[in-house]
C-alpha cells in the first residue's frame, strides 16, 4: 500500500515473514505525531512547531517523523477540525485523518487530498459511506473493529465492494489487546496466507497510553519490532527519537547483505589532489562515523575506501580482508595516479600494518591515526597545523 505523494510517498506492508532472520523485513515502520481537535490552538501550534525539529541524518538515512495524525474528538467544532487539518497540511508531512464522521471526512479531505493522506475512520457502522469518500478522493482507508472478528468481517465486506486500498487499525481498547491483534493479523496474513488480513497495520499508542510519555516510548519500540506499519505517538522530541530511529534502522536492514559503501575516493571539505589521504574499510557504520568526524574537522582530505567485505576494521583485519597487501594494491591501482599527496593515514587499530605498507608503498609516508574516530578532529588539526 502506498500513502502520501511526491517526496512524502511511503510504501507500507509487503512483508513475507514473521521474523526478520527468516529473510528480511521490507517496509519500515513510519511514525506519526498526533494532534486532536480537543487541544487548544496554542498547544496545536506548539506541537506543529516541534515536529520539524527532529530531522537529522544517520548512516546516510534521513530520520524524521514522517506523518501527522489529526484526530477528531466527538462533539468538538467541525469547522475548526478542518482548519487544524489545513494547518497540519502546511507542514509538508503526510497526514492521517482520524475521523468517523462521513461529511466531516469529506470536508477535511478537500483541503489535503492532493497529498494522499490516510482516512482512518471506517468501522462496521459506516464502512460503505467511508469507502465511497476514500475511493472518490483516491486515498487509503483505515479500518477498525471492536474485536478481530468484526474487523475481519468489515475488511471482507470492503474487499467485496472492490476497495483493497486499506490499512488495519489494531484498536485502542488496551495495550494487551492491541499487541495481540497486531500479532494475530500478521500471523494470519503470513502463516495462514489469509489475504483478508494481508494489509499494513496502524497502532495508536497515543491513545493506548495517553499522557504517559515513557510508556509511549516503550510501546513505540515494541510495535516497531512487532508489526506496526504506522505507529502514532503524542510527542517525538530529539531525545526520544535518537534511540527509536537507531532501533528501527537496525530492525529494517537486510540481514542477508552487509551494510557497506562503494569503494572509491571520497573528497571531503573541498579536497583536491594535493589534500591529505586517509583510508578505512567499507563497513557503512565505520564510513559514516569517520566521514562525519572528518567533515567536522573542516580539514580538506581524501577518504579512501577499499573493499573489506563490509566488515569493521578489526574484523576485516582478523579475516584477512584488510591487510598491507590489499591496501597497497588498492592504492597503486586506483589512487596513485589520481592524487599528488603522498601521506596516508591508516586506522589506529591496525597500526601493525605501518611497516609493511611503507615497504610496499615506496615514496608514501604512513601515519597512524588515533584509536577512536572522535579524536580525529584534534589529530587532523595538529597534523596540518
Description of each model-found segment:
Residues 4-5, 10-19, 29-337, 341, ...:
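Conserved mixed alpha/beta catalytic, RNA-binding, or beta-rich assembly cores of soluble enzyme
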Residues 22:
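Extended, highly charged clamp/arch subdomains and adjacent linkers
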Amino acid at each position: 500500500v502506498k500513502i502520501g505523494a511526491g517526496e512524502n510517498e511511503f510504501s507500507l506492508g509487503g512483508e513475507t515473514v514473521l521474523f526478520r532472520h527468516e529473510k528480511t523485513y521490507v517496509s519500515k515502520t513510519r511514525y506519526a505525531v498526533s494532534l486532536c481537535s480537543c487541544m487548544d490552538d496554542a498547544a496545536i501550534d506548539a506541537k506543529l512547531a516541534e515536529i520539524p525539529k527532529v530531522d537529522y541524518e544517520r548512516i546516510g538515512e534521513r530520520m524524521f517523523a514522517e506523518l501527522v495524525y489529526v484526530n477528531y474528538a466527538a462533539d468538538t467544532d467541525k469547522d475548526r477540525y478542518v482548519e487544524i487539518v489545513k494547518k497540519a497540511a502546511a507542514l509538508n508531512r503526510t497526514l492521517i485523518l482520524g475521523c468517523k464522521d462521513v461529511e466531516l471526512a469529506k470536508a477535511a479531505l478537500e483541503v489535503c487530498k492532493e497529498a494522499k493522506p490516510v482516512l482512518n475512520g471506517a468501522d462496521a457502522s459506516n464502512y460503505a459511506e467511508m469507502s465511497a469518500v476514500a475511493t472518490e478522493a483516491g486515498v487509503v482507508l483505515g479500518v477498525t473493529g471492536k474485536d478481530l472478528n468484526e474487523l475481519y468481517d468489515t475488511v471482507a465486506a470492503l474487499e467485496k465492494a472492490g476497495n483493497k486500498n486499506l490499512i488495519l487499525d489494531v484498536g485502542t481498547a488496551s495495550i494487551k489487546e492491541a499487541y495481540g491483534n497486531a500479532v494475530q493479523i500478521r500471523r494470519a496474513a503470513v502463516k495462514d496466507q489469509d489475504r483478508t488480513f494481508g494489509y499494513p497495520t496502524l497502532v495508536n499508542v497515543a491513545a493506548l497510553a495517553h499522557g504517559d510519555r515513557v510508556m509511549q516510548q516503550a510501546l513505540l519500540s515494541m510495535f516497531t519490532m512487532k508489526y506496526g506499519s504506522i505507529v502514532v505517538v503524542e510527542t517525538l522530541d530529539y531525545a526520544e527519537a535518537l534511540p527509536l530511529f537507531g532501533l528501527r534502522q537496525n530492525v529494517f536492514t537486510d540481514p542477508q547483505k552487509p551494510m557497506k559503501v562503494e569503494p572509491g575516493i571520497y573528497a571531503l571539505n573541498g579536497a583536491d589532489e594535493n589534500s591529505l589521504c586517509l583510508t578505512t574499510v567499507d563497513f557503512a557504520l565505520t564510513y559514516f562515523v569517520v566521514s562525519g568526524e572528518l567533515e567536522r574537522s573542516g580539514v580538506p582530505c581524501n577518504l579512501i575506501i577499499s573493499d573489506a567485505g563490509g566488515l569493521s576494521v578489526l574484523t576485516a583485519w582478523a579475516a584477512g580482508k584488510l591487510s598491507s597487501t590489499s591496501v597497497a594494491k588498492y592504492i597503486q591501482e586506483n589512487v596513485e595516479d589520481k592524487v599528488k599527496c603522498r601521506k596516508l593515514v591508516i586506522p589506529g587499530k591496525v597500526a601493525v600494518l605501518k611497516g609493511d605498507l611503507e615497504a610496499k608503498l615506496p615514496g608514501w609516508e604512513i601515519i597512524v591515526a588515533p584509536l577512536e574516530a572522535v579524536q580525529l578532529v584534534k589529530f587532523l588539526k595538529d597534523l596540518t597545523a
